[in-house]
Amino acid sequence: MWLAMPLIIASTLLVMKLTAFGTMKENIAKQFEIFGNKHTWAMTLLYIVTFGSFIGFSMALPLAITVIFGISHVSDAAGVIQHTLKNPNAPSALTYAWIGPFVGALIRPLGGWIADKVGGSIVTQVISAVMVFASAAVGYVMLLAYRSATPEQYFLVFMGLFVLLFAASGIGNGSTFRTIGVIFDRTQAGPVLGWTSAIAAYGAFIAPVVIGAQIKAATPELAMYGFAVFYALCLVLNWWFYLRKGAYVKNP
């Protein structure tokens, strides 16, 4: 399953290159130049942090609410926690799941505005740090809730942290969009935006699958800890490429 996506992407690009002819071939060749630019790959990862997280968590949040908080996690006679008893005080995913994506979408223009004022990469750096903290904290709250007979007691903290994740990803979506426009010239900015958006959109598949798999393994917190590690690595990547002394473009 995990090999299918890169294989499909690679096959699609190969078919585009081999079947192009005439003027189309020249245009394709120019667009493919972005793959030889290291900043394309750096910005792809950073856009996964922002847009990929936004769309991925939009899909995964209802699942997490339903499974983690919709069940009372009670120990049996042998002391093994069972995840089968319905929680009568469970919060409704339909009531709450829309709040995070709404906040993330609403706040995105603010991210672009702030990035125009202080620079895109510094904004991306700040929101990446916030996402490291929030993702790790959500993981810990998941751990507590998934071992509790009354998981609803942790729900408000869980939702607050997830809304923070959505807000940070929304702001970062605006800042990374701005950074791409500064780093690349007009002929490459469009293809890079298309490429990064397409790859980041796979977050809608990856986040629910990862969180769902970890819930099935009774360790939902590991999914969020893993995301926190990824965000931390991308925070270092952003600093190395765009904020350190001698960067190719400082704070684009």
Pin down the residues of each PLM region.
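A membrane-interface helix-boundary motif in multi-pass transporters
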Residues: 1-5, 212-231
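C-terminal membrane-cytosol helix-exit motif in multi-pass small-molecule transporters
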Residues: 5-25, 235-242
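Juxtamembrane intracellular "pre-TM" segments in multi-pass secondary transporters
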Residues: 19-44
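Extracytoplasmic gate region of multi-pass secondary transporters
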Residues: 37-105, 109
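Transmembrane alpha-helical cores of Major Facilitator Superfamily
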Residues: 48, 95-102, 129, 194-202
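Helix-to-loop junctions at the C-terminal end of transmembrane segments
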Residues: 107-120, 215
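C-terminal transmembrane helical hairpin of 12-TM major facilitator-type secondary transporters
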Residues: 121-175
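A late C-terminal transmembrane helix in Major Facilitator Superfamily
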Residues: 183-219
